[in-house]
Every structure is written in C-alpha cells, then in structure tokens.
Amino acid sequence: MGGECGDAWGVAESFLNTLAGPWDFLDPRYPVPQHICEFTYDLIQQGKLTFDKSENDDKVMTFHDSCNVARASRMGDTPGGQFEIPRAIIRATCNHFYDMDEDTIRDRTFCCGGGGGLLTDDLMELRVKGAKPRMDALNNVIQEKGVTHMAAICAICKTQFSKVLPYYGMDMSQIISLHQLVGDAIVLTPDPEDADDDDDDDDAD
C-alpha cells in the first residue's frame, strides 16, 4: 500500500507490479499497488467508516494536487480518480471545502516548489519563489471563501509548504495531511464481539 507520498506512489503505481510482482496470492478485491486514499475511499463507500464532520468545523479546507500524483499516476478504476478520490474523502470528513481556481488544480496544478531535489534549506530563496503560483492561488481562496487550511497527499509538498507558508504571511500549521482529517473526524465504535467479551468477563466475576 502506498502512503501519502507523491514520489513513492508514482514509482509504485508505475513499476511495483513489474519489479516485485506477481501478486496473485493476495485478495483479488484489492488492486496492487493501492494508494492509502483508495483504501480509505473504498471503506467509506462500503459504509465501514463513520465520521463526525463537525470535529473538523474549525477548518475551512482546500486541496493541493501534488505534481507526481496529478500528472504521473492514477487512482481508482476511472480516469481522474487521483483528483476525485482525495476530494471525496475531504467532503466525507469536513463540512467546509472549497477548491482553488480551476486553472490551478487537477492536471493544471502548480508544483509546490520543493520537488526535484530542491527540498533543502540551502535553496530556500528558490523554494519560496517556486511556491509563489500556489501561494497566490491559496491566498485567493482564503480571501474569497475564508479557507483556513490546505490538505495535500505528498510528503514533499507538506514539508515544503510548512516552510514557505510563513514567507507569505500564513502559518505553517495551515498545511495538513488528508488523513489527519480522517483521524480527527472518525467515530470509533466498539465491535459487538468486544461487548460480548466484556459481558462474559462480568459474568465470570
């Protein structure tokens, strides 16, 4: 399973079956490789996850499409899944979500400015300049819709934005993981079998 990392997912989606397969001994219901967002989305579609979206009401969300995920890979069974699946997860876990301008998202997304080996403090000036197109789009949706946080599913993007957001008058905490939203909103209910076990323990006492 691929995590929230654009580079790792690009490699896994393109080459994992070729280099490390075949995976015919695994459950055929799950594609190999599978992104963590696909796995979470499948559970949501099956009704196996319950969320209290109000737990994320302190956030007004937008989403950054990371380069490697947006233009060098895919998710799910339909074209464009890499764009729609993360947004579906946000909508399932949050009450307030707004996309940035259409010309700045999905396959027209901007680089975060930290990829391609630039993620070093020695190149901070270049990184800040490289992030400007995304920062401008983010600032626009902040002004127009009151967005407070931006989610991303790439470790490089999240690290980059946590460093450069303050250069644009924003807080480093405004970039978050998609699955942070999942973790904050998920409702954990006890398994009925666990409850039966507790009853048995009480009877034994």
Language-model features, listed with the residues they occupy:
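Iron-sulfur cluster-binding electron-transfer modules in prokaryotic oxidoreductases
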Residues: 1-205
